[in-house]
């Protein structure tokens, strides 16, 4: 396991061979559109003034799609190669808003909070000509942690995460003195929530109950991506809140602010990530019981009961979309790795943290090395902030383009950036 803070930054100097420069026609925006990047990287603002873009997807021809929180999908096309979208269309405006979106196997897929839809998209079509087709329905939705993100494996199987509408299944939830529910109630709850379900889109339409229950013990995972080298599913989980509220005698506010990691896992069939019973402490590098289940800051589960994270990211950073970097434009160090958008904290003590896009390197076998670094930063704006509303931007979406550019979306002061590499 990794990510003690000593691993916060790793050396990139060894991997800058093998990069393919971006098109010379791309013109960086002033100050890279308000974000900071490593040397040799630049950003152009593809589109601005959008309506709360959540997930981002890029088609093989470079068209960009953003799933909007308030409803519909924004479709963007750059016709002159300067990186800025000069054609904007809206899709699915009559359907509820959502978060998940992907271009896969001739279709544009997108989610609401309870369904997955797709529309057939012929090559070169900005607005898919196909009618909406229901792929998965009856995905559980109880408001809290209801967003549905998804990804595909190389065989075309669809993996959908169903979040847990709770902090830690305490009664009453998030309240002082809350007690955890029985093991039987936890098992019943996790049969419907807090896991990934696997579907075959060729068998559409299906319901959640017809899917294969792949993994369990999640609080909420929006960051899902498939690694084609290791043939494995990876995800970043949003950790729990309010340790100090549940039992302030044992957990101080500062403890809650720094000791509940955002866990990065390989999601194997049968993986159990330990929610609602536990959280992972990134300072002491260990899994501990939460106060609802007898936790006192020392009590730990049996070593093999729950899966430990590969990386324990800092507390409350809020991992959102995750993308596998399949391109060759960026230096070799980045090739075959993953980029993860962190939305940023909203309720931690003191200044808020996160608000970046981080890079996770993988080895030649498609396994995470356990290291990570902040790749794109500056979304928070100048100085520290006390509230997310004070941030300039909040990274939400991230996707790899066909030329190896990286696209980043913000749902606050909503815009999409295209990050490219020139080496200069």
Language-model features: locations:
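Beta-propeller domain segments
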Residues: 25-37, 147, 164-209, 216-389, ...
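Beta-strand-rich domains and repeat architectures in extracellular enzymes and scaffolds
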Residues: 44-69, 318-324, 340-341
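Surface loop/turn motifs at the tips and blade-to-blade linkers of beta-strand repeat domains
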Residues: 45-50, 90-95, 135-142, 212-217, ...
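Structural WD40 beta-propeller signal
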Residues: 49, 59, 104, 151-155, ...
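Hydrophobic core register within WD40 beta-propeller blades
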Residues: 56, 101, 150, 221-224, ...
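Residue position within the beta-strands of beta-propeller blades
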Residues: 65-67, 110-111, 159-161, 234-237, ...
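Acidic, glycine-anchored loop motifs typical of Ca2+
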Residues: 81-87, 126
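Asp-box/WD-like beta-propeller blade repeats and closely related beta-sheet repeat scaffolds
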Residues: 102, 114-153, 166, 183
